[in-house]
């Protein structure tokens, strides 16, 4: 789920006035019903999204339901998937999904979602407390150089993309994964620059003998959410004091993104209708393109017919000239009957071609009329 989609779902969720971070079943069901999907599909979507089976939606569950609903409307899915796509499951919900799949008999999926314990460091006995989150200017330059070498064209880096730099740190693999999860709370495949710098700093601190904390400062964690969207209802307008320290500034601004949905009413009336209209427009564009191709084919055939008619007319004119010469020269020239037969044959061909050309013109006119009616 891309950040723009998630921001859109957040605006819808927030506009429905959740209580203590949860939407009641009636409010959530009202939004889903406005999609005009069949009742059996909506029931399956609800069963998938209500991960903790409490009859309510928190934001993560609401986003899952909305994403699957939109994908069904847009034709990404023909039917409701049997299980929640793994990419939509937040890190905090993976264990619940795994447990639910196990209870339903999907043990292979449960194993897929099983996350090993990363809290216990195999070298914990020799490690010390006092982990320092401060990144000095020199360290920031060093981390930035590493980031620049391994980021893609979008400015993002993946876990595997950074693998070549892990060995020099001498940090156990379980703790490398723990550091990755700390800077990547959303569990995405890639992270951005600020996350990468903090990730490298955590590995540096661990290689210097400091125990990796089990959490990051709240203000820093908030900056890790792509687009700097704060999904905490109680701190929607909170400020970030972390960047007032001499560490580093966020790469993107902190202005609250604007949504194209201003209120729940728009979800029911405008958003689903917009999707439906876009689908109809797409089908109409395809139909127009098909008709245009047919028109082009007819025009090509018509142009060929005109060329043939022109050539036959030249032959006819030539034969008429010969006939006239024959009449002028008397019986010494070619057989008059033979030339007369040639002329009759040419006239027949011209008549057939003329009728064919008129048919093509009529066909083009009909196609053009259909195109105008679709425009």
Swiss-Prot record:
The keyword Membrane applies. GO terms for biological process: actin cytoskeleton organization; actin filament organization; endocytosis; endosomal transport. Residues 5-95, 139-227 form the EH domain. Component of the PAN1 actin cytoskeleton-regulatory complex. Residues 37-72, 171-206 form the EF-hand domain. PANTHER family: ACTIN CYTOSKELETON-REGULATORY COMPLEX PROTEIN END3 (PTHR11216:SF74), EH DOMAIN (PTHR11216). It is a peripheral membrane protein. PROSITE patterns: EF_HAND_2, EH. It is found in: Cell membrane; Endosome membrane; Cytoplasm, Cytoskeleton, Actin patch. GO terms for cellular component: actin cortical patch; cytoplasm; endosome membrane; plasma membrane. It comes from Schizosaccharomyces pombe (strain 972 / ATCC 24843) (Fission yeast). Belongs to the END3 family. The gene is end3. This is Actin cytoskeleton-regulatory complex protein end3. GO terms for molecular function: actin binding; calcium ion binding.
